């Protein structure tokens, strides 16, 4: 399974979302549609999930990560993660999103967050001084 995700940081905190009926928070993004690049998928998902417009030039690759897919047996998730350097609009949860949160080191342990972001992405953002 191939997904892309976006790193959006504001005031030293990372944006994470929780879908309706789910317990785990994740960074905005989602599965690639057929013939879509990871960058195109992320631009589409950001508009669908939080109503912001992003161009391909606004994205910088942060890294590619692999982990067992959440709630799927014998499925590996490949996730391309991008910095979202700029966007147009305001972050507003769509009807498929139950909750948006801005997390940093002071509150990240209070929520369930996706494995790749908890184990790989978030610690690197803290180490690089991008997230408090």
Where on the chain are the PLM-derived regions?
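The catalytic Nudix box helix
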Residues: 28-62
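N-terminal strand-loop-strand
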Residues: 1-27
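Active-site-adjacent beta-strand/loop module that shapes the phosphate/pyrophosphate-binding cleft
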Residues: 2, 65-90
């Amino acid at each position: 399974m191939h997904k892309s995700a976006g790193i959006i940081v504001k005031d030293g905190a990372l944006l994470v979302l929780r879908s309706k009926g789910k317990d785990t928070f994740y960074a905005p993004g989602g599965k690639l549609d057929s013939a879509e690049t990871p960058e195109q998928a992320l631009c589409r998902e950001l508009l669908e999930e939080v109503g912001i417009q992003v161009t391909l030039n606004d994205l910088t690759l942060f890294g590619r990560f692999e982990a067992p897919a959440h709630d799927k047996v014998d499925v590996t998730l490949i996730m391309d993660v991008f910095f979202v350097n700029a966007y147009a609009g305001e972050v507003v949860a769509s009807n498929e999103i139950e909750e948006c949160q801005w997390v940093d080191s002071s509150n990240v342990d209070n929520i369930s967050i996706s494995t790749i972001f908890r184990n790989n992405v978030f610690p690197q953002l803290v180490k690089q001084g991008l997230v408090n």
